Amino acid sequence: SSKTGAYSASISYLNKEGILRNTDHESYNIRLKSDYSFLNNRLTIGQSMIVRLAQGKGNIDQDTMFGILQFPSVVPVYDPTNATGWGTSANINLPNPLGYSNVIDNTNESTRIFLNAYLQAEIIKDLKYKFNVGIRKDHTKSRTYTGIYDLGTFGKNDAPDLKEGSSTYDSWVIENTLNYDKVFGKHNISLLAGYSAQKDKHYGLNGSNSDIPQFIETMTGNTTTMSASSNLKELALVSLFGRVMYSYDDRYLFSASIRRDGSSRFGKGHQYGSFPSVSVGWNINREKFFNPLENVFDQLKIRASYGKLGNQEIGDNYYPTISVVGSGMNYLQGNNIWFGQMPYVNAVSPTNLTWENTETYNIGLDLSLLNGRLTMTADAYV
């Protein structure tokens, strides 16, 4: 037996100063890749990994840009008579752009990891098995600290405010496939069968507080203004699929496939959908009766196909079949009004929601003349 392999590694660093103040960005990128073959290339394995670390500041928002474009240039940037030191204008409801960008400290950090690995084995001659796995992990953090300021008619902040947030995204996908490819005589056949599964998970946590003690940049102080929230979303998808392709002498072409997908977006009894497709083609220029024109026609092919597609995407809604119930509706009990005690339905979703189906019929013509000097493709869809 023999063994061969190849690998590579790289690292890059980026430090970019923003055009405007407090918009710097810094990132590291690491890439690793390797492939190995064993048993005279009957067994191959490989992996690739990308790690990206980034951090930066992002203090520019709509108010800052309006301030840069419209704030009067005759107003001084600094004003020693102002308690917070920034020049203001009483005639325009816009912030001093430099002052506004300096009193708000907005930082972001992110870590992203992408990992892919595969194994391919030739079980017997012409029959191959392949396993793929992909993993992605994202983690981001954001922090916005707003200091004390007095920016005239735009507003003032007598005590610091703080917002912090973090989010994670975890995703994995696995795929198993069997491929059989065989050529015998003028016959060419290719078979594929496979199974795949994937899962995505999003989690976010956010907190904020206002009027916190100066110089203590943590979520402490005024408990009456402290707030926190979190969110969690999960999505799973499983698929079975198969395909057969056949051609005879590259004259008569046939292909058929089917896949069955199941999505966690839909309720029990409506999670699965089947999506077939079939196509046929005829290369007329390869027929014997076409030989007198072979110096003129490079290709004359007619084809027809039918396919059924499924769509599970409903915006960013991972739970479209779950109704949302809230509270806060007032009602009368005896002579007393009970405020916000009665539950009510915010949104009612259909329980029989399922895959969106689209069917397409197609006929087409491919034409090539005079060694490719003139080509034409025509398609009609129903």
Predicted feature residues:
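Transmembrane beta-barrel wall of Gram-negative outer-membrane proteins
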Residues: 1-59, 111-116, 185
